[in-house]
Amino acid sequence: MISSEIGGTIEEILVDMGDKVNKGAVLLRLDQREAKLNLEIAQKTLDKNRVQLQEARNNLRRSKDLFEKGIISASERDNIQTQHDIADAQTAQSESALNLAKKKFEDTIVTAPIPGEIKKRHVSKGESIKDKVPL
């Protein structure tokens, strides 16, 4: 029995009953619009956080020099270190969010897990399905 990892609306069914399929053959596609939008948002968020992390690295490097010269206090240097650490954590979180968005986008395409023959079909084009429900 084949099921989808995610729920959604069936956009296209590429096989009929009786069709023989190879492992990895595309069986159906779910509507990808929301998954694609989430993927784009995750990528842009990561891009933004990488820029902020680079700026925080630059500020941290400058703050160490300024601290050694006695121009800024230890407290100011520590605040800049904290801002760097926050930017680093946000970037890591954004990378995880992007990986999740990629997985969900990939899951909009349902493929055959093994070679075989399509014996039954429980869904139709345009139908909304839930995750893990037999297709």
What kind of feature is each model-predicted range?
Residues 1-5, 96-113:
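Short beta-strand-turn/beta-hairpin segments enriched in glycine/proline and small hydrophobics
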Residues 2-4, 29-32, 41, 110-112, ...:
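Conserved strand-loop elements at the edges of beta-sheets that form or border functional pockets
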Residues 11-14, 20-26, 104, 109-135:
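Surface-exposed patches in structured soluble domains
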Residues 19-30, 40, 52:
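Structured, soluble extracytoplasmic/luminal domains of envelope-associated proteins
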Residues 26, 32-33, 77, 134:
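Short, surface-exposed secondary-structure boundary micro-motifs
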Residues 34-103, 121:
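Alpha-helical coiled-coil segments
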